[in-house]
Amino acid sequence: MARYRCCRSQSQSRCCRRRQRCHRRRRRCCQTRRRAMRCCRRRYRLRCRRH
């Protein structure tokens, strides 16, 4: 399974693919062909769900 990185943003937290990186200033994920994903906290791990 692919792993995702969590990007913190002002309104929401999104996830990026492992290869992709987050913008430092805007703290947003790079453009993806698929829909954007957001991070959800579950116990001690972060998981991504389709937004």
From Swiss-Prot:
<dbReference type="GO" id="GO:0000786">
    <property type="term" value="C:nucleosome"/>
</dbReference>
<dbReference type="GO" id="GO:0035092">
    <property type="term" value="P:sperm DNA condensation"/>
</dbReference>
<dbReference type="GO" id="GO:0030261">
    <property type="term" value="P:chromosome condensation"/>
</dbReference>
<dbReference type="GO" id="GO:0003677">
    <property type="term" value="F:DNA binding"/>
</dbReference>
<keyword id="KW-0544">Nucleosome core</keyword>
<dbReference type="InterPro" id="IPR000221">
    <property type="entry name" value="Protamine_P1"/>
</dbReference>
<keyword id="KW-1015">Disulfide bond</keyword>
<comment type="similarity">
    <text>Belongs to the protamine P1 family.</text>
</comment>
<protein>
    <recommendedName>
        <fullName>Sperm protamine P1</fullName>
    </recommendedName>
</protein>
<keyword id="KW-0539">Nucleus</keyword>
<dbReference type="GO" id="GO:0005634">
    <property type="term" value="C:nucleus"/>
</dbReference>
<keyword id="KW-0221">Differentiation</keyword>
<comment type="subunit">
    <text>Cross-linked by interchain disulfide bonds around the DNA-helix.</text>
</comment>
<keyword id="KW-0238">DNA-binding</keyword>
<keyword id="KW-0158">Chromosome</keyword>
<dbReference type="Pfam" id="PF00260">
    <property type="entry name" value="Protamine_P1"/>
</dbReference>
<comment type="function">
    <text>Protamines substitute for histones in the chromatin of sperm during the haploid phase of spermatogenesis. They compact sperm DNA into a highly condensed, stable and inactive complex.</text>
</comment>
<keyword id="KW-0226">DNA condensation</keyword>
<keyword id="KW-0744">Spermatogenesis</keyword>
<keyword id="KW-0217">Developmental protein</keyword>
